[in-house]
Amino acid sequence: MIGVDTSVLVRYLVGTPLAQARKAAALVDGPEEIGLSPVALAECAHVLRTQYGVERGDILESLIALVQRENVRVLGLRTDVLLGVLVRARQLPGRPIPDALIVAASLAADALPLATFDRDQGRYGVVTREP
């Protein structure tokens, strides 16, 4: 397995600059298993939104498609749990991607309830409580 950072994900998803995008595509679309950090996914979502103006719904669709690839593993998370939370995020106002990743990590580690001051975290179907 080879780890992939945010810069590779962004180049793969936006297709520019062309030379780097082709290299990123060769890696992501290739046979080698790749590992994605949840932090890289969150950072990728942020870069796509702030630097490229991509809508959150489109970002979620791209991340869901990426995570569903046969050769992709999200480090420290179960794919089914992450996909479930990302799919749920599609239905939520604002589609908060970092919140979805926090919930997925807590679910994967069975670290529940989730301590938070953000009352909206419960919309992912997890038990929350204030600290």
Residue positions per predicted region:
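Short, well-structured N-terminal submotif of metal-dependent ribonuclease cores
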Residues: 1-36, 52-61, 119, 131
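Active-site neighborhoods of divalent-metal-dependent phosphate/nucleic-acid chemistry enzymes
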Residues: 72-113
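Acidic, PIN/NYN-like endoribonuclease modules and their adjacent C-terminal/linker elements
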Residues: 1, 103-131
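Alpha-helix capping/helix-boundary segments
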Residues: 8, 40, 81, 101-102, ...
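Short, conserved active-site loops that position catalytic residues or coordinate cofactors/metal ions
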Residues: 38-46
